[in-house]
Amino acid sequence: NYRGFYGSSNIGQGGFNNGFETPFVTSLTCGTGDFDGSSDSENFVRTGSVSNPSGAVAAIGVATSGTHTAYNNIVNMGIYDGIFSKELEYASTAMTSGHLAIYNTYPSDPGDATETFISWSNLIGDPALHLWTDTPDNFDVTYPLSINQGTTSMNIIVEDSNGLPVEGAIVT
């Protein structure tokens, strides 16, 4: 998350050295999601490659340089309130939480600020991106070493580090 003065101080320009730990970036400052040329949001996502990842998996920026700190802060806080307090799981619902925060803060829409700031923030990346907010656990998975032709079902056991079954585990 970056909150500062105009742009993002070029922190997304040269790439990152974060390997496969690609973050969900929010940079709600002037011009970070601008549609006139490449934006900081795009640069965060475009850096790196499939074989040499770097940068972000998705980013939210603001499409214009005419923003105001107070409104950007509310959208920003609404995004993170959605992720951590309301346990919203997707990039798009987190951004919508930011939009609802500004709407709820300024329901009378002073100077068209509510409508404007809702339309200026934008998401670069998959809106259905699942946002993970905790460190994954190590699991022990027990499964057959071979599967006979014609098999239509099998037992797969997923246990946590204490040997307890993991409820709702999905194995692919």
Language-model-derived ranges and their functions:
Residues 1-38, 45-49:
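Catalytic-core segments of thiol-dependent peptidases
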Residues 17-18, 122, 164:
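Generic structural signal for beta-strand residues in well-ordered domains
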Residues 33-135, 139:
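Active-site-proximal C-terminal subdomain of hydrolase catalytic domains
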Residues 145-151:
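Short, solvent-exposed loop/linker segments at the N-terminal edge
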Residues 152-153, 162-172:
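Short, ordered, surface-exposed loop/turn motifs in non-cytosolic proteins
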Residues 158-160:
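Short solvent-exposed capping/turn motifs at the termini of beta-strands
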